[in-house]
Amino acid sequence: MEFSKNMVPSEAGGNVKNRERPAIIIGAGPAGLTAAWELQKAGCPSVVLEKDRVVGGLARTVCFEGYRFDIGGHRFFTKVDAVNRMWHEILGIDLLRRSRLSRIYFKGKYFNYPLKFLNVLFGLGLKHSSLATLSCIRAKARPRLPEVSMEDWVINRFGRVLYETFFKTYTEKVWGIACTEIRADWAEQRIRGVSLSSLIATMLLFRRGDQIKTLTTSFYYPKLGPGQMWENVRSRLAAAGNPVLTGAEVTSITHNGHLITEVAINGGEESERFPVSQVISSMPLRELISKLNPPAPSKVLEAALDLRYRDFLTVALIVNKAHLFADNWIYIHDPSVKVGRIQNFGNWSSDMVPVAGHSCLGLEYFCFENDDLWSMDDCDLLALASREVSVLGLAPMAAIVGGTVVRMPKAYPVYDAVYRSKLRIIRDYLDCFSNLHPIGRNGLHKYNNQDHSMFTAMLAVRNILGEEHDIWAVNSDCEYHEEMDEASDMVDSESRI
């Protein structure tokens, strides 16, 4: 994204080019570091505050005994040209082109993802497939209206049989709540552009060129994992005098009712205070509201507390066998195991695995912070993951030679029945602060991808430099346009949530 010469810094919180009052960016994930990068390109100083000891957020890469793994696999795929340019600018030849293969594992069989009609037909068998087709016809003839829940949305497009076969178990494993409690807009965002009828039509009409919106047949991936991207950005920011401070937890955000004036980190004797011109925040909205000083109105505080999150942990297993399976990752729909998804990081990049003939698997478990799974000892989680990968037939227990566990709180904002009304209350209040800019997945409480988070950061910087974009309205559901000049096409027609 290029900044035109006629853009000027916003005066809302003072001159953003004043190094005495830099822009403060909360969070060093893709959104926060992208914001710092774009400000640097515009000649504006910033300080990034990250409470963890490493950068990258959910897009970090962890190194264990030389083996690298993601906190969930991160494909680098976008139709936003500015995001694509940034990836290539930072990574250069280390940004690899990879073929995508991901499948569903269900009752001992593999199914293509997204679903393909013939694959489903032969995988389920004639009887089950016939029932699925009749169920879909019935759903089309008598759709569930109004379409409120994720269950409504999926049944209307696939019928109840396929919903219960492929969607219900996995979705409830991921979110920890019933599909009837998940809003339909989550399904619209994550499963868009596909239905059983469209799959059948594609097969019968031989429309081989048609691409389902959620499907990409290839993607980019950094040689050493997504953390390589964000470590590189951090280094370049620091070299230009724009520090990224880790272990810097925000404890207080002071305001005067319409401007943020100061951000404090790490309370007590080590407290440090930053006077600010602008604040860009990717921290969870619940935490942002709780840090405001003076406190937000009780109605806003209560709304923030009602926002829910799903937490996540990865068990990385080192296996002394190669070529365990061809997929980048596998979705585990089988209800007999707790694991939700399994990554094979050597299939993302061979440089993630330092020893020839070995593999590094990432078993992903979805949980709530402090529940039984989250609270298990690491040794028990390693034993659980080893048993489950063996039961699934993906790796023999005897071949597992090591492993580690990484926990990630607040990985996914939950789209439950009340989140939209609570988010409206929070947004209306935050709109009072002219120099506060929420961005990213948790900053906006939107279940979006890495490129979408980066795009919201780019728009926030444009706003600081004098443009006007409604970041809350950025629509991660639609087809992205190639140029940032067409950013207006990426926002919902209804800008309010």
Regions found by a protein language model. Name each.
Residues 144, 277, 281-288, 374-381, ...:
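Conserved mid-domain beta->alpha element of the FAD-binding
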Residues 21-48:
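N-terminal Rossmann-like FAD-binding beta1-loop-alpha1 element of flavoenzymes
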Residues 120, 125, 130-253, 275:
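Active-site/ligand-binding neighborhood in enzyme catalytic cores
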Residues 40-63:
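Glycine-rich FAD pyrophosphate-binding loop
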Residues 3, 13, 409, 416-497:
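C-terminal lid/capping helical subdomain adjacent to the catalytic/cofactor pocket in oxidative enzymes
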